[in-house]
């Protein structure tokens, strides 16, 4: 049976969706999995750079995903949905609530929860690299209040969030790679002593291999949140299907 997945880019930047699609198609076999892509409407912000734009993007996208049963993006037409924004994005909770209310057989995953849960399981020191500075307190608060396990806290494995001081849409520009790499080396690797660096924005998608090669001698694992989010989502779907 074909597995149907919807990847939701909640901002209105089509270039971001194209980048996500390119990364996913390089990483995943599509033989038994059909992946569709949704870009936020024009009323959604072009980039999500904090709480206000997160809420605006949720308000713009949610009706298109849960209200119109004729839409190709209607949530119950999919086995799983990946919200491709690295935050505690309100779309995740809203769609989960609707799915639970209607007893819909669909798994919903966000990039933040899947990444932190992976790091909790691995049990190594980890930190986040993000875009603009506004995200530092937002991500730190979300991680510390909702997603850490007791083991992670007790062993002091969570090291915090670092900003590149770049806007989301600038993260993928080749001319900014050296700046990003220098910040990661100075802050995430040397100062915070991270074994895992979470690439904490969908704008980093596709940079995992380049960063891994750059810091090969340090042995640092760079976690592509799109890749780990999709892997976890597919595993959840397969488990649900195995129980039928």
From Swiss-Prot:
Pfam families: Asp_Glu_race. GO terms for molecular function: amino-acid racemase activity. InterPro entries: Asp/Glu/hydantoin_racemase (IPR015942), Hydantoin_racemase-like (IPR052186), Iso_Racemase_Enz_sf (IPR053714). Belongs to the HyuE racemase family. It comes from the Eukaryota. Induction: Expression is regulated by various nitrogen sources. Sensitive to nitrogen catabolite repression. This is Protein DCG1.
């Amino acid at each position: 049976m074909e597995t149907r997945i919807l990847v939701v880019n909640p901002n209105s930047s089509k270039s971001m969706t194209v980048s996500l699609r390119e990364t996913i198609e390089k990483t995943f076999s599509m033989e038994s999995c059909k992946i569709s892509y949704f870009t936020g409407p024009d009323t959604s912000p072009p980039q999500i750079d904090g709480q206000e734009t997160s809420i605006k993007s949720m308000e713009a996208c949610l009706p298109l995903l849960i209200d119109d049963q004729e839409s190709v993006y209607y949530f119950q037409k999919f086995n799983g949905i990946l919200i491709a924004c690295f935050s505690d994005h309100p779309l995740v909770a809203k769609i989960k609530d609707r799915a639970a209310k209607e007893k819909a057989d669909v798994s919903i995953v966000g990039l933040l929860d899947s990444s932190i849960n992976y790091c909790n399981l691995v049990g190594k020191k980890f930190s986040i690299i993000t875009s603009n500075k506004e995200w530092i307190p937002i991500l730190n608060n979300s991680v510390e209040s909702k997603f850490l396990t007791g083991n992670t806290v007790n062993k002091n494995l969570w090291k915090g969030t670092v900003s590149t001081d770049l806007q989301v849409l600038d993260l993928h520009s080749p001319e900014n790679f050296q700046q990003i790499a220098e910040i990661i080396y100075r802050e995430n690797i040397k100062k915070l002593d991270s074994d895992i660096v979470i690439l904490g924005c969908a704008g980093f998608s596709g940079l995992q291999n380049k960063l891994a090669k750059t810091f090969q001698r340090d042995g640092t694992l760079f976690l592509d949140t799109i890749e780990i989010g999709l892997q976890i989502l597919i595993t959840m779907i397969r488990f649900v299907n195995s129980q039928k």
